[in-house]
Every structure is written in C-alpha cells, then in structure tokens.
C-alpha cells in the first residue's frame, strides 16, 4: 500500500 502509516491490508485502504 502506498503512503499512510497504517493501512488495512484486507481492504487495501488508507486509514
């Protein structure tokens, strides 16, 4: 996942 400190691997979204 590009950018973001934490990202939901399952949804591939930035938190």
UniProtKB/Swiss-Prot annotation:
Q: In which tissues is it expressed?
A: Expressed by the venom gland.
A GO molecular function held by the record: toxin activity
pH dependence, record text: Optimum pH is 9.0 (at 25 degrees Celsius).
Q: Which UniProt keywords apply?
A: Blood coagulation cascade activating toxin, Disulfide bond, Glycoprotein, Hemostasis impairing toxin, Hydrolase, Protease, Secreted, Serine protease, Toxin
- From the UniProt record, give one GO term of the biological process aspect: proteolysis
Domain Peptidase S1, by residue range, is 1-15
Coiled coil ranges (UniProt) are none
Q: How does it assemble?
A: Monomer.
- Describe the family membership recorded for this protein in Swiss-Prot or TrEMBL: Belongs to the peptidase S1 family. Snake venom subfamily.
Functional description taken from the UniProt entry: Thrombin-like snake venom serine protease that has high fibrinogen-clotting activity (2025 NIH units/mg) on human fibrinogen. Shows esterase and amidase activities.
Q: What is the protein named?
A: Thrombin-like enzyme acutobin-2
Q: Which organism is it from?
A: Deinagkistrodon acutus
Lineage of the source organism?
Eukaryota, Metazoa, Chordata, Craniata, Vertebrata
């Amino acid at each position: 996942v590009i950018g973001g400190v934490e990202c939901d691997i399952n949804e591939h979204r930035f938190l």
